[in-house]
Design a protein with these regions (language model features):
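S-adenosyl-L-methionine
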Residues: 1-49, 57-64, 87-113
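Conserved beta-strand/loop positions that form the S-adenosyl-L-methionine
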Residues: 51, 74
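Conserved glycine-rich SAM-binding loop
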Residues: 54
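Short beta-strand element of Class I
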Residues: 69-72
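Conserved SAM/SAH-binding beta-strand->alpha-helix loop
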Residues: 77
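Conserved short alpha-helix immediately C-terminal to the canonical SAM/SAH-binding motif I
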Residues: 80
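Conserved SAM-binding loop
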Residues: 84
């Protein structure tokens, strides 16, 4: 199991839809898409956050059902986020992204009024 986890951590670094930034780097440099998520998504669609998204199943399902919205899943566990990031990459989904960080850090990822909804589904 640990071997798979290390492989997933390594693969996480290759996903364009999975953002992993150290707390120190976030404090020092900020997040490159803060206030500019529309540039990453390539549209001005509303953004919904899912906090504690785990494997990203809910974000992926909603992104499939609502291609006119953008979804961002947050979780601290990289091995879990791997599943969602991999699925979204395999399906070439452009309306879903994932961020690996602690929940209390989310304000550093968004400008005021950049997020339409925040969901906690557990």
């Amino acid at each position: 199991m640990a071997h798979h986890k290390l492989e997933r951590f390594a693969e996480n670094l290759t996903f364009a839809n999975l953002f992993q930034i150290s707390f120190e780097q976030l404090e020092r440099e900020g997040f490159e898409y803060r206030g500019r998520w529309s540039e990453w998504f390539g549209n001005e669609a509303p953004i919904t956050l899912e906090l504690g998204c785990g494997k990203g199943d809910y974000c992926i399902a909603l992104a499939r059902m609502h291609p006119d919205r953008n979804y961002i899943g947050f979780d601290i566990k990289g091995a879990r986020l791997w599943r969602g990031a991999k699925t979204a990459t395999e399906e070439a989904m452009r309306n879903v992204a994932f961020v690996r960080t602690r929940i209390e850090m989310i304000d550093r990822f968004f400008a005021e009024r950049e997020v339409s909804e925040i969901w906690i589904t557990f």
